[in-house]
């Protein structure tokens, strides 16, 4: 199982969407672009996701669902799949982490962990 998990590399890029945010209403919109790279020897299909989002007040929310952005992509060996999505937070800083549930061509299911990453409005972190 560990070998399967290590065959998937996940890269994240985040952006603060200032023009759609409203700090006076405690509404901070962030986008995140995820690149999922299959370093393994067989294709894998992303079946579902689980996100845990913790804002600066310590409030935690979980988001689970099938696929990503309406797709359940199959990622062939040595290729990547990329998508962009977004989330709204009540604070200008939050941390997201989670995992993707993946299935190999042989039908073996495993979780590909997504390491914690920051969502931050500019000017908050030094």
Curated annotation (Swiss-Prot):
A Pfam family: DUF525
PROSITE patterns: APAG
Residue ranges occupied by any ApaG domain in the UniProt entry: 2-126
InterPro entries: ApaG-like, ApaG_domain, ApaG_sf, Uncharacterised_ApaG
Coiled-coil regions listed: none
Record's protein name: Protein ApaG
């Amino acid at each position: 199982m560990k070998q399967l998990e290590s065959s998937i590399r996940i890269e994240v890029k985040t952006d603060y969407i200032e023009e759609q945010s409203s700090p006076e209403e405690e509404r901070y919109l962030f986008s995140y672009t995820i690149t999922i790279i299959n370093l393994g020897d067989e294709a894998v299909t992303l079946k579902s996701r689980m996100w845990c989002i913790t804002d600066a007040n310590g409030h935690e929310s979980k988001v689970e669902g099938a696929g990503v952005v309406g797709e359940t992509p199959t990622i062939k060996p040595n290729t990547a799949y990329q998508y962009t999505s977004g989330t709204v937070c009540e604070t200008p800083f939050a941390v997201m982490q989670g995992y993707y549930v993946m299935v190999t061509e042989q039908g073996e299911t495993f979780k590909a962990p997504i390491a914690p990453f920051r969502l931050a409005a500019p000017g908050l972190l030094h």
